[in-house]
Amino acid sequence: MRKLEQFAWSNSRFILEALTRRRQPIELTEKTTLKVNQVFANHQRNQAFNEEFGCERLLPSYAFVLGYRFLGQLLLQANIPSKLAGLIHLSSQFTYVSEHDFSKDCDVEVTLTGFRQSSKGILYSFKTVLFQRGIKTLENTNMVLDKSPHYKSNKAKSKGNWEQASYDVIAKLPVTIDTAWRYAKLSGDFNPIHLHKLSAKALGLPNALIHGMYNLHWSLAQLDTSMLKNWQSI
């Protein structure tokens, strides 16, 4: 496994690396891990997150927001064949290891743990691990798809209306492009597939998609906090 240990990049370094990055054939792709020590707590962003989702304390899923910048830092150095714009986030799982205090500094380790070709495109798996005082606190595992332009779904489009289905709806939220831009500024995720229907179509999608993590944060925020009190995995 290729191992990198670095400081957090500046915005100018990110831009430079993004402009000069070259995609590599999948044969050269290898598991890669990036460790960034002493990541300072961002109290302004912490507060903005709580205000956006109406939380009294940060949700476990905030670990994704904290690690997102370093996921980008890893992707810009990993030898992968994919463009970074247009990657589709499929799933995210959070595992509690020990107590994490988001108001304190931490170390972040991000790893490209796996990759494979599929009928839909290239699937990547990533794991983000947070540490405080040398102790592992939270793990976040994510699946990401680089969708093949040649892939066509075999599933017939549903003609039903989800509102007619038998769901126990506890909350609803209208989601707009303004919502997507607001979350992009909060999280740093400016993937074009979320921000306008034209940029989404240019990347092979029929329309813009709200960030999947926005849906997760908002859904968790609607739950009774006692349901998250003794959580082990989400």
Task: List each language-model region with its residue ranges.
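Acyl-thioester-processing domains in fatty-acid/polyketide/NRPS systems
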Residues: 2, 57, 140, 230-234
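Hot-dog-fold acyl-thioester-processing enzymes
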Residues: 1-89, 155, 159-226
